[in-house]
Amino acid sequence: MKRGLIAAIGVVALLAGATACGSDDKADSGKKTGPDSYKGQTLTVWAMDGSTPPGWTKDLTAAFKKKTGATLKFQTQKWDGIQQKITTALSESTPPDVIEVGNTQTPAYAATGGLSDLSDLKAEIGGDWVEALNESSVFDGKQYAAPWYFANRVVIYNKKVWADAGITDTPKTRDEFFKDLDAIKKKGKAEPIYLPGQNWYFFDGLTIGQGADLVKKEGDKYVSNLSDPKVTAAMELYKKYQAYSKAPKDKDEATPQQAEVFAKGNVGAFIGMGWEAGTAIAANKKIESDIGYFTIPGETADKPEGVFLGGSNFAVAAGSKKQDLAKEFLKLSLSDQFEGQLAKENGVIPNKESLNSNLTGNGAAEAAAPAAAVGGTTPLIPEWAAVENAPNPIKSYMTAVLNGKSPADAAKAVEAEINKRLSQKS
């Protein structure tokens, strides 16, 4: 099956009584274009906290008013509880017109019938969207959202530790990376890399790099594919990286926070999101000048390692009375001007490779961007959400392999639990 972008959520039951802010303006009457064609109307957009920087929001709102005559109203949402809130809003008669949805949540919302088909818009403005970034917006062959912005993991390293080990450049291939870790290990003063045994999303990136699928279809249901040789190859790579680390084999990157471990100054590198460098700096201001970034290298210099892509799409609520006006918003917000401005102001990866120049000067974003085209996520099926619920059986698999169990035996030990979770009805 085709790999997709973050674990799709389970379709939760529609709960009455939840509050959803919608639009109360009159419906569009036919297709209209040009200044003032939608004069007097208001388009309501739900966007997540932190997604819309002030400059971008101000400029886009003004441009939207100038182009359409309509007013743009952003309503900021918190991540906590958002899946239920969106699901409820999409079931109501006056939903928000446009909604920012987590990229892997998109197929689940589309499956409920809550999102509009944007296939015509894709044909008009999405010809050069990065395929890997657009994948989560497609469900059953139709375009139900538009890719907005993304982020992925990079190698965050301590330049002083690397220089002390005689390393003069960042690695461009996986083998070069291992040689650098060997050099740091030989120097003996620092832990080459901090990698706990359950950094699940880094492992998922390795499976993507190996072309592996974590689930497969058997009849009309999905089952675990953890015993597949490609998954095994990814786990063997993870094991090789983890052997350079003193981190616990039964913990993830948040226990303890890996950036805080790195901040102590005696770790060569860790694999994380660019913003985690800020966590390290907050813990130890002195380390700021020693922090550098590079793309996680793949087998060859021309293709980075696979990465887990996180991000957001814009979707139009099927129940919105302003379908045409919503599409005008998407055309403008996803234009090169505003997609590029968002990338520059928020340091996020844009939906087109041609816009990556807007990341210049942002070391973490520059390191992340090259891998976006070869990125992916966990399976884009609603059933997947239950698999990642704690305790995640794949994390148990990882720890078992790192502690000496064969990948085949470790997979066999958890596949029944994975299959049980995949069979749960939302």
Language model segments and positions:
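Extracytoplasmic "Venus flytrap"/periplasmic binding protein-like
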Residues: 63-129, 138, 163-165, 172, ...
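Extracytoplasmic/periplasmic solute-binding protein
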Residues: 144-148, 153, 178-224, 267
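Conserved C-terminal helix/tail region of periplasmic/extracytoplasmic solute-binding proteins
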Residues: 42, 71, 163, 374-426
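Extracytoplasmic/periplasmic substrate-recognition and gating elements
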Residues: 62, 165, 232, 236, ...
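Conserved N-terminal structural module of periplasmic/extracytoplasmic solute-binding proteins
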Residues: 3-15, 22-106, 251, 285, ...
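Long, aromatic- and glycine/proline-rich binding clefts that accommodate carbohydrate-like moieties
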Residues: 132-136, 294-295, 343-390
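Glycine-centered hinge/linker elements that transmit conformational signals in sensory
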Residues: 181-182, 223-251
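Hinge/lid segment of periplasmic solute-binding proteins
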Residues: 103-152, 178, 292-294, 362-364
